[in-house]
């Protein structure tokens, strides 16, 4: 019973860290990346549709993103959606493709992005700690029900704490790497 709680908590912590990594991918670090557009929804024939489903997105240069819509009539809608998403990007439309030049980040913008990274890191750590708390509660219920002994409870609780420390260290490492990437000029 206790092993199941351990396994479950491990999986949930892993998912929390993976979600954090995906979230960080959308933070612009001065280099062009198609993941910046992951959350952009285009009003396509009345239905909100992700840009990635409507166009081929390529990165021909380090600071340039090219969006080639499958349906040329949707080019205006895609451009509007990118502007509306307020990503600090200025798309230019030549009728067949949309080009987005990524300007070099200012020192102030870099600091703002580092703050965002730290905020996301804190949210990920909270998620990991919540998993720890829930798992410890589950273990206490098992002990109360007589399914595990008090010694087992202590051992499993220590194991969960070790896992928590491991995943929080992972979040810190990911955050440190992203901050370094952002602060590179």
Curated annotation (Swiss-Prot):
GO terms for cellular component: cytoplasm. Keywords: Cytoplasm, Protein biosynthesis. Pfam families: RRF. GO terms for molecular function: ribosomal large subunit binding. InterPro entries: Ribosome_recyc_fac (IPR002661), Ribosome_recyc_fac_dom (IPR023584), RRF_sf (IPR036191). SUPFAM superfamilies: Ribosome recycling factor, RRF. It is found in: Cytoplasm. GO terms for biological process: translational termination. Belongs to the RRF family. Responsible for the release of ribosomes from messenger RNA at the termination of protein biosynthesis. May increase the efficiency of translation by recycling ribosomes from one round of translation to another. This is Ribosome-recycling factor.
């Amino acid at each position: 019973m206790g092993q199941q709680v351990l396994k479950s908590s491990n999986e949930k912590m892993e998912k929390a860290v993976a979600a954090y990594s995906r979230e960080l991918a959308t933070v612009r670090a001065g280099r062009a990346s198609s993941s910046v557009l992951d959350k952009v929804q285009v009003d396509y024939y009345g239905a909100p549709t992700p840009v990635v489903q409507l166009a081929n997105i390529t990165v021909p240069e380090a600071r340039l993103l090219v969006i080639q819509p499958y349906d040329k009539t949707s080019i205006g809608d895609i451009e509007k959606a990118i502007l509306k998403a307020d990503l600090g990007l200025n798309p230019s439309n030549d009728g067949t493709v949309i080009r987005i030049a990524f300007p070099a980040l200012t020192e102030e913008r870099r600091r703002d992005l580092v703050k965002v990274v730290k905020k996301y890191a804190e949210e990920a750590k909270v998620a990991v700690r919540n998993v720890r708390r829930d798992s410890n509660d589950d273990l206490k219920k098992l002990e109360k029900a007589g399914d595990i002994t008090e010694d087992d409870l202590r051992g499993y609780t220590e194991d969960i704490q070790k896992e928590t420390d491991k995943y929080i260290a992972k979040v810190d490492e990911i955050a440190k790497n992203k901050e370094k990437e952002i602060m590179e000029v």
